[in-house]
Amino acid sequence: MSEEELGKLNEKMEAIIGLSKAPSQNIVFFSLLGTGKTMTVGEISSEVGLTSKATERAVAKLLEKELIQRAPFRARSYSCDSKEILLGLLVTVQNLKERLDKRGL
């Protein structure tokens, strides 16, 4: 994996950590990640109990952060790449372990 790819993964992991400060984005992200489904804004709204407008704003922000993607095969639908998120988490854990090892912890 290139340094650029690692950098992008680290940025995404930081963005995920930052979702705790954005409750609507947090709930939409984890709903898409947890279900593994491709969903429309209306479906996401029903799933998580947010208004359509709040869901639209959350989806727009998550797209901007590249934490979710537009589904290529279903109009106005979104999904979350769980494999990419898992890879990012593994890289983050590996980095954390290396830092702890350097400190002798």
Regions inferred by a protein language model and the residue ranges of each:
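Short, cationic-aromatic polyanion-contact patches
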Residues: A15-Q25, T40, F73-N95
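Amphipathic alpha-helical dimerization/coiled-coil segments
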Residues: S2, L87-L105
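Pre-recognition alpha-helix immediately N-terminal to the DNA-recognition helix
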Residues: N26-S31
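A short, conserved structural fragment
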Residues: L63-F73
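Short amphipathic alpha-helical interaction segments
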Residues: G49-E64
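Short, Lys/Arg-enriched N-terminal segment that forms or immediately precedes the first helix
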Residues: S2-G18
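Short helix-capping/hinge SLiMs at alpha-helix to coil transitions
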Residues: L32-G36
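A short acidic, leucine-rich amphipathic alpha-helix
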Residues: E43-S46
